[in-house]
Amino acid sequence: SAPWDVTVSYGAGTALAPDALIEASTQLDLYDASAPGAWLGGIATADIDYSLQEESRKLRADAERVIEHLEEGGAPDDERIERRLRRINEGCAAMNDNIYRQARQWLSQGKVVGLVGGDHSTPYGLIRAVAEKEGSLGILHIDAHCDLREAYEGFEFSHASIMFNVLRDLPQVSKLVQVGVRDYCDAEAERAASDGRIAMFDSRSLARAGFAGTTWAESCRRIVDELPEVVYISFDIDGLTIEHCPHTGTPVPGGITFEQVVYLMECVADSGRRIAGFDLVEVVPCPEDKIDAVVGARVLYKLCGLALRTSSA
């Protein structure tokens, strides 16, 4: 897990998700029709590294000063801001290396590795490790956002930059299939339209297709057809409709439902493709309302089960 939320640009708190998801997981029944008996293959959680959480807390204070400075119209080349940005970027790079080393260790033992964030910057090291191991793969990216911004707010490893960084740095990633996106800038729209590696199934287009009579099964076939044989799933909880994640850091109206996304992931597994790794990010737990963690735990269990099912097929 990566209890880390340094670069969040709106609401914080996703660094607390790993603990909350473990707690919520105790309310799960083991039978899963998507992958019956998959849990018998073994699902384990590595110990949470609370030193990461503490480093995140310290760097988050720097990030808040940077964001406030920029929002107030301050110059990005202010010397104090540059010092803070340097600390943040160095800290995020170290976090990525930490995750990368852990992932390589587990992958070398033949494990299927998933990561629980944390914000959406956290899976970079895992994606890198899985990409290097597999040689070639595609990413199924479920999200309200494209995450194709370059160094958003000056943060080289921003949660809004994860897919920009992946496409720039990892030639093994042959395809990025984005589903549910509905909040993005002109530059991201232009990038998605011009880069042949990107297939975007935005929330508006999916909804309009449904209104015009296209079934969700037909839409899922189109989505899955874009994916290569080896798939990594990057699941930002805010890709779901807002009742499933009311406290996530950057909530956006619209999206896809829990049942729709489960069907989509089942279609990936049913197609014979192999899920080689995954992440679940941007879950923000709330002490007064457990729904974010409850939904997150169930998404995570589905990801684990389907990954195990496809790895043993």
Report residues per predicted region.
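Conserved alpha-helical scaffold segments that buttress catalytic/binding sites
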Residues: 1-313
